[in-house]
Amino acid sequence: GAMEEISAVCSLQFDDRGDDNDDGVEIWYYNLDKRQSEGSYGFAYTPGSDSDEGLVAINWSTYQNADGSFKNSIASGSFYGITFMQELSHASGLKHPHDKGLLDQPRFPGLTHRSNEFRDKGDFDQNAHPFTQLSYVDKGARNGMVPESIEAYGFLQTPGALDIAALQWMYGINPDAASGDDTYTLPLENREGTGWRAIWDTGGVDRITAAGA
């Protein structure tokens, strides 16, 4: 899940203590009616932003029908699967690239307060998926790398390369991740759960294979 993917690239670890007293991160699920929930995927409070810092709230009614069935796939790699990773990343201290930080940290290079958060990709066109899962330039990023519409595949399964750099700057690296000889196999088709992965690998003799493609 999202916790494991974040912990795999940096020294931040998530432990279930069995209670909610002074937790660093809390995850809530809530439901809104159709009118209220339109466009609301979830939200989170970054450290230092609010007395509820570390809270992750997911609007379950965006993803699930009244009978419990899912409206769209929430599999890792799907468009809706991004929400869980993105909100947990906010609770861990990451911001949107188009926003300034609480301590006036700058926006992504090439973006200003006049930038369109859903369209402008900044320097080198990297304020977009799959370089960062915190960008609002997601579906239809016009870079040929992600689907043009909501799909069950084609989006990030892990923090993007820029997200990994930020997490490691804040928390330090995970020095033990993928330390052996690893093989990374490229998927052969676009189907539910197929998505982008940014590799953080700390050792061994590794290879990327497209065998069977």
Q: Regions from the language model: what does each represent?
A:
Residues 1-213:
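RTX-like calcium-binding, glycine/aspartate-rich low-complexity repeat tracts
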